[in-house]
Amino acid sequence: MKLMQELAEIIPGKAYNDVKVMVAMSGGVDSSTVAAYLHRVGYKVIGVTLQLHNNFTSTQTNRKTCCAGSDIFDAKRVAAQFGFLHYVVNMEETFRKEVIENFAESYLKGETPVPCVKCNQTVKFRDLMKIAKSLSVDALATGHYVRRLTTTNGVELHKGIDPSKDQSYFLFNTTREQLEFLRFPLGNLKKSETRDLARKLSVDISEKPESQDICFVNGKSYADVIKKFRPDAQRPGKILSTDGEVLGTHNGTIHYTIGQRHGLQLSAPIPLYVVKIDAQNNIIIVGTRDKLQQRSLYVKEVNWLDRKELTAGLECEVKLRSGADTVKGYLYPNGELLKVSLAEEPKCAIAPGQACVMYHGSKVLGGGWIV
């Protein structure tokens, strides 16, 4: 099986029973299957689950978010079923400050944030790596659908082979040092194959549905989450046309995102879209679809993973949203920013706060945040 071939390379040249692996267990099918399989074939497995928000005591089973209270119990249940060590680490304070509050502040600035990237960058990789080192393990394995390939140029991050499950967009901020230590056993599998393996192993939660929502939103609107941290966030303001004409009013910029068409409550003979959010002046600017079209953008805080130097004019494929197709682009370093010139109009709106991830084929070259 392809999974076995991948697992066999966790630490090349070492017997399975001589390798200690920490598995980041979210309580879902994917990471539970990784932990169960590694344990079954002989690895010394330690499962670690992060308690990220204060619903730990909840045992609801119909939640469709990751890291819910019931997920922690599921992770503990799988560890008990297979007989390996499992720890729960309380990271609520860090998660609140670095993920939830960052999410709220980003929306207040008129951006459209991607909290899952921030979560992976901070508590799920940076802090899990510290825990792994403290436990003196040889590697940290996760249930992400990406691939880690060792080449003559070093370790590289690649897309998972299943396009519908590939999570490389959310992991662009992984560092080279982290990649040396991380393992992604599911990168060569389709989701259906993972679930089949879970059934074959008789994992208790093999039929558990996938998580779909942002974990801390939990059925609420994004605005509800933001208002919890900033009660003053919902201030009424003007909706203007691109020509400066007042078309209506809004009930807070936090309710809008670039490219949004529905919910504007405007009477117009043609469809109008949000083309700009001026959060500082509390103004929403709308226009026709062509006003969204642009062929260049700037990116900040670039994490460059490729071993080759980032030079002006480098050709690559660019992904501007997690569910969007890639578009051919050219990269031009510009001081602290990176200019990205696109060969064609992207099908999605370019929104500040979203991640821009660059690829060469399946390889992740790097990425950053759209400004």
Curated annotation (Swiss-Prot):
Domain of life: Bacteria
Region span, Interaction with tRNA: 165-167
Main location: cytoplasm
InterPro entries: MnmA-like, MnmA-like_C, MnmA-like_central, MnmA-like_central_sf, Rossmann-like_a/b/a_fold
UniProt keyword terms in alphabetical order: ATP-binding, Cytoplasm, Disulfide bond, Nucleotide-binding, RNA-binding, Transferase, tRNA processing, tRNA-binding
Function: Catalyzes the 2-thiolation of uridine at the wobble position (U34) of tRNA, leading to the formation of s(2)U34.
Name the record gives this protein: tRNA-specific 2-thiouridylase MnmA
